[in-house]
């Protein structure tokens, strides 16, 4: 990360507080260059660094990145192994810089399937940055939106089984309290790179009223200009949340 400076000169005052990004296109980017897919994933790490720096510089409250879905285990073993090793190396190389710049790192998803080595890196990184109060950086790893909802439902079912909760008392609020990111500001904007127009099982609960922004730019080519363009496009949207009157939900 580069040093964080406050700079909102080129952005609308109606910028989102919480942005989530589906980082798509690493494989195609590598293929276009005649390289193996892992080459694209390595290049994508640089885009992560740029995105985090931009988010912190422009005072976003939270940035959530879709790094590895629960469906990605179906990819070739060689690619999965390379991704896991890249994850370890990225944590080792980036966490001190994140901490220096007051970023709080959280990994959301079912990390139990990861190697003990990777789980230890995750715990160590989260612990180091736990007390930081700057940008909240969430990395979704072995994450799926359906999994997230199911694990929340299971917590409620356990409460019902123990007699601590009546089924009739189950509400959106009670389920939300067990869903990932519930303690953070709601997701305002979802950006997907790579040209596909779908959500891919990402934050299904959390993005109910988020604005969606799709770009053909492949993730390794994602830079500050593309990010700024997405935020400025967001500023032109009228968010109604099911009503008829536009609501400025980004106001703190």
UniProtKB/Swiss-Prot annotation:
Keyword Ion transport among record annotations: no
Lineage top rank: taxon: Bacteria
Cofactor binding note of this UniProt entry: Binds 2 magnesium ions per subunit.
Cofactor requirement: Mg(2+)
Keywords: Cell shape, Cell wall biogenesis/degradation, Magnesium, Metal-binding, Peptidoglycan synthesis, Transferase
Catalytic residues as annotated in Swiss-Prot or TrEMBL: 24, 72
CDD domains xref list: Cis_IPPS
The family this protein is said to belong to: Belongs to the UPP synthase family.
Subunit and interaction comment: Homodimer.
NCBIfam families, sorted: PRK10240.1, PRK14830.1, uppS
Protein name: Ditrans,polycis-undecaprenyl-diphosphate synthase ((2E,6E)-farnesyl-diphosphate specific)
Naturally occurring in which organism (per UniProt): Yersinia pestis
